[in-house]
Amino acid sequence: LKDGTGIVAAELVAIEKGCEELLSRRKSGWIVTDSEGAIGALRKWKSEDRVTQDIKRAIWQGEREAIDITIRIRGPKTETQEADRAAKKARDRPQVDLETYCNKAEVRQKFREKELTKWQSEWGKRNHRREHIGFPAVTDEWPGLNERAVQLVTGHGYFKAYYRRFKLREGSGLCECGEAEETADHVWWECTVEERERARREFTEAVGTRADVRQKLSEVHRDRLISELNKLADAIVRDDSNLEQ
């Protein structure tokens, strides 16, 4: 608004912004004004004022799109007079306050975005975690890994060394190949048990080396890799009942 803009003109601009907001949200609603002058301007059949014409066009557009925009005066005359006095004081302020409202779905979406941003920040601080290498971005979409593939990627699951580390089972934690502790990395890339070697060979032929896996897991288009990873995990991750007691 230009300096010296009248109260009625300022109120009409506020009403125009309210109409634009309702149309953009495709939502019916009430716009309440304290200015009798603004209501009087809108009641005139013809008006050369651009803002008044834009408000009427917005109301007509809303009718065509089944969006009901209603503009009315607030309360008794004494309240209007008080509002006019407040408006005169506000006219001299360097900025204009505009208050908008969100529906429940928009509030939930904004809250979700805020939480994801917070989780991403925390996740980014933990880049020593093995799963962080494959999944650097926090999202609310499941990547498609099955139960055993999740264990393989995170390192938490049906592995003897994992059970021994947290004292969940007694035993040495040694892999059935006898060469090292049974961890996710060992099972995935080092174990010499024949069926695991065969599954690893098929996986490597389809996907690539360990470095290739880390790179491709970070790509947007990774459906084939996820499928191959699920297949590999089913072949090399043992069931809980098969672990030593």
Swiss-Prot record:
<dbReference type="InterPro" id="IPR012337">
    <property type="entry name" value="RNaseH-like_sf"/>
</dbReference>
<feature type="region of interest" description="Nucleic acid-binding endonuclease">
    <location>
        <begin position="106"/>
        <end position="245"/>
    </location>
</feature>
<dbReference type="GO" id="GO:0004519">
    <property type="term" value="F:endonuclease activity"/>
</dbReference>
<dbReference type="GO" id="GO:0003964">
    <property type="term" value="F:RNA-directed DNA polymerase activity"/>
</dbReference>
<keyword id="KW-0808">Transferase</keyword>
<dbReference type="InterPro" id="IPR036397">
    <property type="entry name" value="RNaseH_sf"/>
</dbReference>
<keyword id="KW-0255">Endonuclease</keyword>
<keyword id="KW-0378">Hydrolase</keyword>
<protein>
    <recommendedName>
        <fullName>Retrovirus-related Pol polyprotein from type-1 retrotransposable element R1</fullName>
        <ecNumber>2.7.7.49</ecNumber>
    </recommendedName>
</protein>
<keyword id="KW-0814">Transposable element</keyword>
<keyword id="KW-0548">Nucleotidyltransferase</keyword>
<dbReference type="GO" id="GO:0003676">
    <property type="term" value="F:nucleic acid binding"/>
</dbReference>
<keyword id="KW-0695">RNA-directed DNA polymerase</keyword>
<feature type="domain" description="Reverse transcriptase">
    <location>
        <begin position="1"/>
        <end position="105"/>
    </location>
</feature>
<keyword id="KW-0540">Nuclease</keyword>
